[in-house]
Amino acid sequence: MFSNPGAFFLGTLVPSEQMFIKTVLESARVNGYNKIVEPCAGAFAMSHLAVQTGFAPQQIEASDVSMFTSIMGYAITGQSLEALELHADGFTDEELLNPAIALYAWKYLSMIKDAEKEYFYAHLIDMERRRDEHIAVLQQQLDRAKSILHGMSYRALDMWEHLEEVIDDPHALVIPNPPTYTAGFEKYYDT
């Protein structure tokens, strides 16, 4: 799994789902919608698709309550991770202010609980041996996402609170992406 850390940033939508959502986004844009709201942003798949269909990043609001997404969202929007108050065994608080290291720590520590399985143990060993390489790849992926989405807004915010804020905006297209679909990442929440 971690042999391709870039997979974190590709989203979980299959091509047919991406095409459908792109069609919806394109139609919304030409019909007067000027704001995309992505609660439960995950890996920001909807935000990426919105940019691909002509929305400016400044027209995108995203939110989530997961640590993975919040680290990414803060990195993309240039916010300090200090507000997240990250603490993790084996990492200094100062290290965890670096988004790539914070994502590495999140993944590494979430895999430890499955280390008795050979598959996960092998990945943990790889992560330890090639720590700097994994962090560098994560940084490249964060830089790529930032180059595409910089200008959007992100908050660590509950979906219901975000929906309440935008429910009466007639120009906002709300596309929540909760982790309840077949390819979802419910396991991200088991840490």
Please tell me what each predicted stretch does.
Residues M1-T191:
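Class I S-adenosyl-L-methionine-dependent methyltransferase catalytic core
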